Amino acid sequence: MIHPLTYIHPDAKIGPNVKIDPFTTIHRNVEIGEGTWIGSNVTVMEGARIGKNCKIFPSSVISAIPQDLKFRGEETHTLIGDNTTIRECVTINRGTSDRNQTSIGNNCLIMAYSHIAHDCEIGNNCIFSNNTTLAGHITVGDNVVLAGLTAVQQFVRIGSFAFVTGGSLVRKDVPPFVKAAREPLSYVGVNSVGLKRRGFSLEKINHILDIYRILFVRGYNVSKALSIIETEIPVSDERDEIITFIRETGRGIMKGYTRRNEDLA
C-alpha cells in the first residue's frame, strides 16, 4: 500500500507489494524492490537502488548528494541490498566520481542516527549500532559489528568478522576476525564470540589466534610477522585473507594493545 499523502516522482520504479507511509518523498531515478516497507517522513533521493524486503524507518534520508566540495552533480548511486533494515534518522549519501556509488549489502542492520558517507562499501550481514559514523571511501567486509558511537576515518578498511567496541575512533585499518578496542584503537583479541555464532570451529578460531599472536603479540614488525606467518602457519582461506588484507593497506594497520600505546594517546 502506498499512502496517498506520499509523493512519488513519475520516473521512480516501485516494485510489487511495496508499502510507503505518509509524508515520504521518493525522487526521480529511484528503484525500490518488492516487499520493501518505507516509514513516514523518509526522503529517498536520486540514484537510490533499494533491494527487496527492506525496512526503512521514519526520518531517514537515503541517497542525498555527497558532503564533498568536489562533487559536481555527476550521476551516482546508492545501492542497498535485500533484507536490510535502516532505522530512524539514518543518513546515507550517494557516491562521487571516485567509486560512483555507495553500497550496503544484504541482511544489514543500520541503527538509528548512523551516517554512511559517500563511496562507502559495506558488506553483507553487518550491524552498525546507534550513532555509528562513517566518513567517505570506507570499505567494510561481511559480518562486521560496529558498536554504538563508533567513528571511522575516511579511506579506512575494516575486515570481515571484525568487532569494534563502542565509542571507538577508527583511524587505521582493522584486520579480519579481530576484536578492536581502547584508545588508540588496538587489537585486543580475536572476535571469538562472533566467530562461534557464525559457525567457526574452535580449531579454526585457534588457527586465527595463532596468526594474530605472531602479528600483534610477539613484537615483530609487520613485514617480519607476515614472513613468519607464511612460513609457520598452515595455508587456509583465513590465513590468506589476513595476509592479503594487511599487504593491501593504505592507511596502515592498527597496533596491538600495550600500556605504552595508551600512554602515548
Segments from the language model and where they lie:
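Structural signal for interior beta-strand "rungs" in well-ordered beta-sheet cores
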Residues: 2-186
